[in-house]
Amino acid sequence: SEVDDEDRAHRHLSHLYEWYPGDGGRDDLHAAVAHTLDTRGDDSTGWSLAWKIALRARLGDAAAVSCLLRLATRAASPEGGHRGGLYPNLFASHPPYQIDGNFGLVSGVLEALVQSHRPGRIDLLPALPAEMGTGRVRGLIARPGIRLDLDWCDSEPVALTLEAVKPSTA
């Protein structure tokens, strides 16, 4: 049965921890996670937007990642209400400033580029926004300790370098 939630759009998503940053290992949760995010809506504070970006990236939803990135990087005013965006100094808004919005935004973008939460597998560009169709990253560390350099063009990988940075036990 449906639960009557007084605040369906609440910004907290801690009940989705298993999906991200956890290993999200249960594919049967995919629809439930998507439903929760759909119900909560997109707009929120900086740190909540960052978490939503990472969750949508983990779902492989590039279009939603793109939409959320636009919300997370829009201009924010210190006089504004509780919504995300960036202040003129590029601090993520809550308001006030909260560092987890900035760190989380970077983590969410990285999750859209590379995922390594499933043992023995690295997924490249799993939720790449269309606006990021060409690019490169250097020095990412994937699980279980693999340094990764990646170039892509037209949303497809064109060059990849992998280097073990620690002995693997996997």
Regions found by a protein language model. Give the residues of each.
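Short, surface-exposed connector motifs at secondary-structure boundaries
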Residues: 48-49, 158
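Well-ordered alpha-helical scaffold segments within catalytic/enzyme domains
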Residues: 17-27, 51-60, 108-117
